[in-house]
UniProtKB/Swiss-Prot annotation:
Name the record gives this protein: Large ribosomal subunit protein uL15
PROSITE patterns in UniProt: RIBOSOMAL_L15
Nucleotide-binding found in the keyword field: no
Disulfide bridge map: none
Purpose of the protein: Binds to the 23S rRNA.
A Gene Ontology term for the protein's cellular component: cytosolic large ribosomal subunit
Keywords: Ribonucleoprotein, Ribosomal protein, RNA-binding, rRNA-binding
Pfam families referenced in this protein's UniProt entry, alphabetically: Ribosomal_L27A
Subunit structure: Part of the 50S ribosomal subunit.
């Protein structure tokens, strides 16, 4: 780049000597030939040391603890609907079914639904869903409603 030319992106070049060719080792007896910088003999010269080998130190995969427990294949997962959500969806009370909740967008179709007791309810609801928690059942019956569990 000439001394007087302005500094622009299309004029930029790497500094001289900044970009050097990759050294190809083990090609003939010149520099980095023959033993290719590995020294003579020994395990490290023979490409038999795995990358994970830590030189006799306890390996990382053995230093970490094993995972405990297991994943239960028979676990049932429910979609959760709380009482405060039911109070906003049904302000006048009435019948609450899984199909109604799907239609109102509270839950997805073809999944089990469980009503939990977070929040308060003051209207009578006739709830028929897959499962209901104990606290939710108490609050619904105290408000004058009924509970039917499908499962």
């Amino acid at each position: 780049m000439a001394e007087n030319s302005p500094l622009k992106a299309h004029n930029l070049r790497p500094a001289p000597g900044a970009k050097t060719a990759k050294t190809r080792v083990g090609r003939g007896e010149a520099s980095k030939g023959k033993t290719a910088g590995r020294g003579t003999k020994g395990t490290k010269a023979r490409y038999q040391v795995p990358e994970r080998f830590e030189g006799g130190q306890m390996p990382l995969h053995m230093r970490l603890p094993k995972l405990k427990g297991f994943k239960n294949p028979f676990r049932t997962e429910y979609q959760v609907v709380n009482l405060d959500k039911l109070a906003t969806l049904y302000p006048e009370g009435g019948e609450v079914t899984v199909a109604d909740l799907v239609a109102k967008g509270a839950v997805r179709n073809n999944h089990l639904v469980k009503v939990l007791g977070q929040g308060e309810i003051s209207v009578a609801l006739q709830v028929s869903v897959d499962a209901v928690s104990g606290s939710a059942k108490e609050k619904i019956t105290a408000a004058g409603g009924t509970v039917t569990e499908l499962v």
